[in-house]
């Protein structure tokens, strides 16, 4: 199976993200570049995974409470605060991974892999991400099925740290999450039953599933 078939499995014949792409727009993405199209088409099923229960519209206030990975450069006192927040998101993703076949579409083949690897905190992770980068480049693909939790967490860290954009497709639950928006991650959930489950998981881990219609 390829990523196009996986994406088709989310909506069947009801809709395809490619329908929203203008004909004169060059796009080779099955889903990665289309979070906004999904949200426009299905606002009631679209959410953000977020640190905050509501959008903070005052930018001055948001900047004072926001935290992201690059803020920790030259400021070691922030790294533990950042890692605590990151772990909350990783716990949610781990639980989704455990119950699903997981596919990704990613920009990893198109980025400077040395720069991306520098954001990872162990030599094993740096080596592995370079291996995956080479494999994807050699195959000419931007997508893969993730069977290994270690590989899954590599992409999580690279996305949350804003180094590599990736969309995660949790095939069984028909949940899609786009990562490279620091700690605000667009999400689509097709089935209300699994949306409710995800809401409980988020609450347990200390983050919010924020509706776009709130």
Task: Label each residue range with its predicted role.
Residues 1-184, 189-214:
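Structured alpha/beta or helical-core interaction and ligand-binding surfaces enriched in interleaved
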């Amino acid at each position: 199976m390829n990523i196009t078939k996986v994406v088709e499995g989310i909506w069947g014949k009801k809709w395809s993200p490619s329908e929203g792409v203008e004909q004169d727009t060059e796009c080779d993405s099955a889903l990665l570049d289309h979070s906004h199209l999904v949200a426009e088409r299905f606002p009631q099923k679209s959410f953000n995974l977020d640190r905050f229960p509501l959008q903070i519209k005052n930018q001055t206030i948001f900047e004072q409470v926001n935290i992201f990975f690059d803020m920790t450069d030259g400021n070691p006192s922030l790294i533990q605060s950042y890692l605590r927040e990151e772990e909350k998101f990783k716990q949610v993703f781990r639980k989704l991974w455990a119950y699903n076949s997981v596919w990704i579409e990613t920009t990893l083949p198109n980025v400077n892999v040395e720069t991306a690897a520098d954001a990872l905190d162990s030599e094993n992770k740096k080596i592995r991400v370079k291996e995956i980068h080479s494999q994807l480049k050699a195959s000419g693909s931007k997508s893969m099925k993730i069977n290994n939790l270690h590989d899954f967490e590599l992409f999580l860290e690279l996305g949350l740290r804003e180094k590599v954009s990736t969309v995660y497709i949790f095939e069984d639950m028909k949940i899609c999450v786009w990562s490279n928006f620091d700690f605000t991650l667009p999400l689509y959930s097709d089935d209300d039953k699994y949306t409710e489950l995800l809401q409980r998981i988020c609450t347990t881990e200390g983050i919010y599933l924020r509706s776009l219609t709130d």
